[in-house]
């Protein structure tokens, strides 16, 4: 009887671990509204772009159309190419709320991203040469979000209680500014506002690859 109870408990624990793994492996989703001082054009899209070391967009990862000023982004589980990864060092981190002394535990290579609005000029449902890219200000309540890929588990800590753990694969971090600064790793987040600002001066062809 005791052996049976032990087996049942073991099965429950294993099942919980499996479901937890599946939940974390689910595609990440970000949804919210688009804000602009001007009327939004019908062919406006919201995209997630990989960034180079300087923080400039380098290649589109995912995008969403804008309907009634709303969008929903879904990020695939596909890993970025090796040449899109950069060693995780302090100088590479420009996350909201990351201030003061930064402490990184573990060694990892990451791929950073940025969210931008753009005009899909040829209506091909993706960013291509000739499309107009806009500077965009992304907020979530009193903070913002970070979308980052890591090839290993690592931890980033800083002043005011900033504490973020990156797991292998894609990470969606929701950051709430304050004292302390709260960081949560989540699978989805709603209510993310993308404010469309001025046009960027990049050459569009630069954004088509690493």
Model-based region annotation:
Residues 28-38:
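A short, amphipathic beta-strand motif
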Residues 32, 55, 62-79:
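Glycine-centered loop-to-beta-strand initiation motif
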Residues 74-88, 149-151:
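Short Pro-Gly-centered beta-turn/loop motif in secreted/extracellular proteins
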Residues 120-132:
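Acidic, glycine-anchored loop motifs typical of Ca2+
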Residues 2-11:
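Bacterial N-terminal signal peptides that target proteins for export
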Residues 37-54:
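Short, ordered, surface-exposed loop/turn motifs in non-cytosolic proteins
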């Amino acid at each position: 009887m005791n052996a049976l109870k032990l087996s049942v408990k073991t099965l429950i624990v294993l099942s919980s671990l499996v479901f937890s793994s599946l939940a974390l492996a689910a595609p990440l989703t970000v949804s919210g509204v688009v804000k602009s001082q001007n009327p939004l054009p019908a062919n406006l899209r919201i995209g997630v772009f990989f960034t180079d070391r300087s923080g400039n967009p380098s290649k589109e990862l995912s995008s969403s159309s804008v309907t009634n000023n709303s969008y929903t982004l879904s990020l695939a589980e596909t890993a970025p190419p090796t040449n899109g990864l950069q060693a995780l060092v302090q100088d590479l981190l420009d996350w909201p709320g990351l201030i003061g002394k930064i402490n990184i535990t573990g060694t990892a290579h990451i791929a950073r991203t940025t969210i931008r609005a753009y005009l899909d000029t040829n209506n091909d449902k993706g960013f291509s040469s000739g499309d107009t890219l806009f500077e965009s200000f992304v907020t979530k309540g009193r903070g913002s979000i970070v979308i980052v890929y890591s090839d290993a588990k690592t931890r980033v800590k800083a002043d005011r209680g900033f504490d973020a753990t990156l797991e292998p694969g894609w990470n969606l971090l929701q950051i709430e500014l304050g004292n302390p600064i709260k960081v949560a790793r989540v699978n989805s987040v709603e209510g993310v506002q993308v404010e469309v600002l001025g046009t960027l001066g990049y050459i569009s062809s630069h954004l088509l690859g690493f």
